[in-house]
Amino acid sequence: MPLNVSFTNRNYDLDYDSVQPYFYCDEEENFYQQQQQSELQPPAPSEDIWKKFELLPTPPLSPSRRSGLCSPSYVAVTPFSLRGDNDGGGGSFSTADQLEMVTELLGGDMVNQSFICDPDDETFIKNIIIQDCMWSGFSAAAKLVSEKLASYQAARKDSGSPNPARGHSVCSTSSLYLQDLSAAASECIDPSVVFPYPLNDGSSPKSCPSQDSSAFSPSSDSLLSSTESSPQGSPEPLVLHEETPPTTSSDSEEEQEDEEEIDVVSVEKRQAPGKRSESGSPSAGGHSKPPHSPLVLKRCHVSTHQHNYAAPPSTRKDYPAAKRVKLDSVRVLRQISNNRKCTSPRSSDTEENDKRRTHNVLERQRRNELKRSFFALRDQIPELENNEKAPKVVILKKATAYILSVQAEEQKLISEEDLLRKRREQLKHKLEQLRNSCA
């Protein structure tokens, strides 16, 4: 799609100047010139997207993984000395000069978010395209950094001397700058996992050039700590690996905080500091490690092992020998008591079953006897004598009425018996009188 330019003169040089800010690797281009040309031409979509949609500014960029500086195969084994004199190892920059360079380069946020690298490198173009596609606006920061880097490189060329120890000092400074950067980069996700083409083209370890590439740590406190830790009198070799960077105070605090947190990767994460402390110790001969760290791969992939919820919870803990003996004795006693408890419930259950069985037998006998007594009572009642289906309530009512009638009859019979007895007594007395009169 052609770009609509508001120029009246159709000059190809002017057209190229208007489109020139869209090219990435132009070290002589001024970043602030785009603001002056914004009235003459429309801005780039990647630069104007936040103003167009009114979104928040981009988050800080993650540290990039360049093949020239912080590739996993890069190893720097150089003596380091901060003395500016000729006796202490040939250092060309003093501590004040180095700190001034770091503070000037770390002054702006745009420089803090970018990583200084060789602009002629092929991976630099790839990384610029990646960062611009992902974060939108990385190219402008890279231009500003490349301009400042070019000025410092020119200053180094002017103040250059044929002293061969100067290259070693510059390599040592850049290796010091790479310490915290490699420590931060080992915690990041490897871009080769995400992107199809390899970012680290050069697998062989490269020497540290003083003009093409230089890396600065994102904080000056780590530089001070590293310079104070190294002795000034005797040069000490520094071995820098990407996977196992030397642990600083901030790294140890972050590792302690990571150990306190519980996550999916906590087991692998806690095993890493021990390995770092072993490999981060200074040694004379440094060997390159495989390009990809297993820690990075573990951070990329979440563990797929799931907890077996059907299994009983494991309460196993490691105790000293004395505590283990006590716990074993306690366990034996508990097993004995549990066995006793298990035997007593069994005996009690059998006793209860026997009691229930005898109770059922007795209850059945009582019901049979009650039924027989009801049948006998029914047979005594003349009204229900032939009624085999008479209910118990009817039997009881009829029996009560029959008993009352029988009692009334009994009273009548008793009264009649008394009358008959009196009559008999009277007749006996009259018979005796007749016998006495006849005699």
Swiss-Prot record:
Glycosylation, residue list: 58
Positions with biased composition (Acidic residues): 251-263
- Residues in the signal sequence: none
List the biased-composition ranges (Polar residues): 335-347
Gene Ontology MF terms: DNA binding; DNA-binding transcription factor activity, RNA polymerase II-specific; E-box binding; protein dimerization activity; protein-containing complex binding
Residues of the bHLH domain: 354-406
Q: Which residues carry this modification: Phosphothreonine?
A: 8, 58, 315
Residues where N6-acetyllysine is found: 143, 148, 157, 275, 317, 323, 371
Q: Name one GO cellular component term.
A: nucleoplasm
Q: Where is the composition biased (Basic and acidic residues)?
A: 266-278
The UniProt regions of compositional bias labelled Low complexity, in chain numbering, are 203-237
- Region labeled Disordered — which residues? 202-295, 335-365
This chain belongs to which protein, by name?
Myc proto-oncogene protein
Q: Which organism is it from?
A: Pan paniscus (Pygmy chimpanzee)
